[in-house]
Swiss-Prot record:
PANTHER family: UVRABC SYSTEM PROTEIN C, UVRC/OXIDOREDUCTASE. It comes from Corynebacterium efficiens (strain DSM 44549 / YS-314 / AJ 12310 / JCM 11189 / NBRC 100395). Residues 208-243 form the UVR domain. HAMAP family: UvrC (MF_00203). It is found in: Cytoplasm. It holds the Pfam family UvrC_RNaseH_dom. This is UvrABC system protein C. The gene is uvrC. Its main location: cytoplasm.
């Protein structure tokens, strides 16, 4: 931990222009990114009386060991570069509004030949379009159940679809008209596509259009005396209206707007956003983040009234949230375009609604409101009405959003008090039990997984402050200690330990020594800046899954590499014994110990991650095809071949000319495929 005075820039060396700056720690990781109208004025604040800094800012300046900056032409450029660097370096002291993966959503797998609609909770995936998020899982399932009456698109998994395709008869949903049964050819690919388009159109907010079309069809059926069809359309309209009733009309003028509000205390901030489309609330989400305190606040900032940090929080949220949303939408659009090009048809003609709405209603005007508006308008490609509602329905809705933010912060604090106390107690107990100099703020654990020596893999999981840091997880295929159906768990532990800490040494050496003391902005520093070198610093505690033999193997690697500042232990599964290097007897923690509970949690997470990877590798090996080893034949072309001929067996019956007729195959590649499938006897 460095004293800020040791890396303070020399007087007069900091420019007075607008710019963006980075603080780095002694491992050269970027730990904070900020922007300023005047770099000299802003950076000087960090090196004044540190006792006057916000607690989190004070922690940051002591964790840092150098500072760099880049001068830009305007405040708008500074705002954009700050967003880019936060995305690139993921600094731990910046406010980050990450997508909450626990929110339930309704998803449509647009990348499949016959897209399906399904309930989903988790990180976003390629080739899938998402609607929501919803506040409750039952709301997603009920909405889907009602809508497939009107839009009977596929909802089954790939396995169920293939099974019924082979059986030649549909599932129950096909018999009760809640699925158009594309698996048995009841509808063509194009007809199913039209159903999906209607579903996506409705979920995108074009509800009036769908209602008008159904009403017109119902009236036409009635006039033609087709009362059975008219009754079915009437029931479909009832289902549509039931879905719409659940999305209460809050703004009667058909407004498309996002409403955003914060609730804060001294250390944290909760933000809620309501998405209103066509006057109805279509989605809601929220985050709780730590405040950085890195803002120029007025001298009377402790006075009663609104939190003076709110404008800064609002600015950061708007730029980060909509920047991420536009980037994600562009990625999804590119995937759709690739799919359209590959299939040769325009599968989804319905226009996707703008990610940045026409109107953004905020609790307070953001800091540098004009610059923020310009950034949002660039993201939208059109004007954005960014304002604080003063009266009427919009003001009432803002108060509702503020109330939700306050409730979210309250519930978070209640939960956090319990969680933080338990984690702190567990880390303290581990420190005392293992006689460590400090509590292990970073813990790493490795585990081996295999079945009778096949597909031998290892996992490395990371916990920081007692919580999993999944972005730092690593997976390894064991190379030296396994093969030919044999596996040595002890040697495998040694191999993983060696590879992990060799990576540590390599990442530490990635930055030349002459740049270690850089406190200015120049081209060399920028060229050597690297994205998150997460293994450039060691853990305080390294856990291996196993007993004394595994610990001894890892300790040999430590001795070989000269690692002396990492505590090494083994956690044996059967009796939950903790083994230390060289000790004849294990450490036994009480069964109700918070320390043991945390160590078990880390070990079990490593086991889960290893098992998952092992299953993936085993499944991959079992899916090996005769086409896999053909030179010049990648995954896309293999898929195209099997799709065209139906199976490898039918492909084997094809001639070179037949193969050359497949899209993307020339005579030379077709000949290679033919020869690979017909080897000389």
């Amino acid at each position: 931990m460095a004293d800020p005075t040791t890396y303070r820039p020399a007087p007069g060396t900091i420019p007075t222009e607008p710019g963006v700056y980075k603080f780095r720690d002694d491992a050269r990781r970027v730990i904070y990114v900020g922007k300023a109208k005047n770099l000299r004025a802003r950076l000087s604040n960090y090196f004044q009386d540190v006792t006057q800094l916000h607690p989190r800012t004070r922690q940051m300046v002591f964790a840092a060991s150098s500072v760099e900056w880049t001068v830009v032409g305007s405040e708008v450029e500074a705002l954009q570069l700050e967003y880019t660097w936060i995305k690139r370096f993921d600094p731990r002291f910046n406010v980050k509004y990450r997508d909450d993966k626990s929110y339930p959503m309704l998803a449509v797998s647009t990348g499949e030949r016959f897209p399906r609609a399904f309930f989903y909770r988790g990180p976003r995936r390629k080739g899938v379009r998402y609607y929501g998020p919803y506040s409750h899982a039952w709301a997603v399932r009920e909405t889907l159940d009602l809508l497939i009456r009107v839009f009977p698109m596929r909802t089954c998994s790939k396995g169920v679809f293939n099974r019924h395709e082979n059986l030649g008869r549909p599932c129950l949903l096909g018999y009760i008209d809640k699925c158009a049964a594309p698996c048995v050819g009841r509808v063509s690919e194009e007809e199913h596509r039209e159903i999906v388009e209607g579903f996506c159109s409705f979920m995108s907010g074009h509800t009036d259009k769908v209602t008008r079309e159904l009403t017109a069809e119902m009236m036409a059926a009635s006039e033609e005396l087709d009362f059975e069809r008219a009754a079915r359309l009437r029931d479909d309209l009832g289902a549509i209206n039931k879905v719409m009733e659940k999305q209460a009309v809050v703004l009667g003028d058909g407004t498309d707007a996002d409403i955003i509000a914060f609730a804060t205390d001294e250390l944290e901030a909760a933000v809620q956003i309501f998405h209103v489309r066509g006057g109805r609330i279509r989605g809601q989400r929220g985050w709780v983040v730590e405040k950085t305190g890195d803002w120029d606040l007025p001298d009377d900032s402790d006075a009663e009234g609104p939190d003076p940090a709110l404008p800064h929080l609002m600015q950061h949220f708007l730029v980060q949230f909509y920047g991420d949303a536009v980037e994600r939408a562009e990625s999804e659009a590119a995937e759709d375009a690739e799919h359209i090009e590959r299939r040769g048809v325009d599968q989804y003609r319905e226009a996707t609604p703008a990610v940045v709405p026409r109107e953004i209603l905020v609790q307070v005007e953001p800091h540098e409101a004009q610059e923020t508006r310009k950034v949002l308008e660039e993201l939208r490609g059109a004007g954005v009405d960014l304002r604080v509602p003063q009266r009427g329905d919009k003001r009432s809705l803002m108060e509702t959003v503020e109330k939700n933010a306050r409730e979210q912060l309250k519930q978070h604090k209640i939960k956090r008090v319990g969680d933080l106390t338990a984690r702190s107690a567990a880390l303290q107990d581990i420190q005392e039990a293992l006689d460590m100099e400090q509590a292990p703020l970073r813990i790493e654990c490795t585990d081996i997984s295999h079945i009778q020596g096949t597909d031998v893999v290892a996992s490395l999981v990371v916990f920081e402050d007692g919580l999993p840091r999944k972005s730092d997880y690593r997976r390894y295929r064991i190379k030296e200690a396994a093969g030919d159906g044999h596996s040595n768990d002890v040697a495998s532990i040694a191999e993983v330990t060696r590879r992990r800490f060799l990576r540590h040494h390599r990442d530490k050496l990635a930055v030349p020594e002459e740049l270690d003391d850089a406190t200015f902005s120049d081209e060399k520093v920028e060229e050597m800046s690297t994205d998150n070198r997460r293994f450039a610093y060691p853990p305080q505690l390294f856990i291996v899954d196993g007993g004394a033999p595994q610990v001894a193997a890892a300790q040999e690697v430590f001795d070989e590499l000269g690692i002396v500042d990492v505590t090494l232990v083994g956690l044996a599964k059967r009796l939950e014994e903790i083994w230390l290097p060289g000790d004849p007897d294990p450490v036994i923690l009480p069964r109700n110990s918070p320390a043991l509970f945390l160590l078990q949690q880390v070990r079990d997470e490593a086991h889960r991650f290893a098992i998952t990877y092992h299953r993936q590798q085993r499944s991959k090996r079992m899916r090996v095809s005769e086409l896999d080893d053909i030179r010049g034949l990648g995954q896309a072309r293999r898929t195209e071949l099997v799709k065209h001929f139906g199976s490898v067996a039918r492909l084997r019956e094809a001639t070179v000319g037949d193969i050359a007729g497949v899209r993307g195959f020339g005579p030379k590649l077709a000949q290679s495929v033919f020869e690979a499938l017909h080897p000389p006897e």
